[in-house]
Amino acid sequence: MASVSANPLPRLILYHQTTHDPDGNLISILPLITQPEIRLTHIIVAAIHINEDPDGLTLNDRPPSDPRFTTLWAELRIAQASGITVLGMLGGAAKGSYTRLDADAASFERYYAPLAALIRARGLQGLDLDVEEPMSLGGVVRLVDRLRGDFGPGFVITLAPVATALLDPRRNLSGFDYAALEAMRGPQIAWYNAQFYCGWGDAHTPLLYEMCVARGWDPAKLVMGLVTTPDNGAGWVPFEVLAVTLRMLALRFPRFGGVMGWEYFNGRPGGKGRPWEWAQAMTRLLGTAGPGHAAVAAAESQAKPSPPVEIDPDSEQGVQVPIPRSFEYHTDDDNSDEDSK
């Protein structure tokens, strides 16, 4: 394994949700560690769901303690030991998690406690908040504050807005205004995994990313989210086109925040047989070699608590807009773990 880089940016992030093939065989993440020329900084395991029963927390559609996930959790520990930061993803296309966390204080405590217990039990180093249902600004601030208070300054808190939400709160799946959240709790949020796909952004050119920066977003905190294959959603960008976009962003923004990919198991060019090749391709396009994991983790652990801010629970929410393409949630009855993000 190559030595750790002193440069914490750009990040290279992969979501890992489809953890097993249709026959129930584990899709191993170990090649992301053992294969050459991969500089992966973060893995985000998805998707954690808070269900009606507060004690019925699930990873996709099974309890996180299900024997099906035993090897998955072990491999994630190996990834951590190799310097890759491992986060969980809460929410996604399946609704309900954030509605339950956005209720009164007593309800919040009931639903939050099992989530916190899961983070501790599995040694997750952070949580990605993928809010794809209406949530109040006060509700998301309360959640961020509680995570920071419970898990300390080294815990990585990220959010996953659609890219357009960073320009216009009306083009948003989350309800709250991300600019307002950044103004109130920016020091607590490590970065934003902005979705530049499925009709909510375009990575064929650097234009939308540049517009976000012009609007005031720090490029070091703005990660360009991509689909790793056309099978994972509209907006896939061929590598030769993406190379130009990333080169332009790196030249214009020396502290470019990096890229994330949705998701690992079938990414091009290797597809299901060699899914790690997407990370190899991105490592080349980003112009990096060798894992820079420790430097990234050190840079992200500098968040400091911010003073409390009075939140109006009746503050105006962003307008919910329709998802531009059909999303389907596949359960194990369909022999799949897939939950479109």
Predicted feature locations:
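Short linear regulatory motifs embedded in intrinsically disordered, acidic Ser/Thr-rich regions
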Residues: S306-P313, I323-S340
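Extracellular/luminal ectodomains of metazoan preproproteins built from arrays
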Residues: A295-A299
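Chitinase-like catalytic core of GlcNAc-active glycosidases
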Residues: A2-A243, F253-F256, F265-H293
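Functionally critical loop-and-helix segments that line ligand-binding/catalytic clefts
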Residues: W262
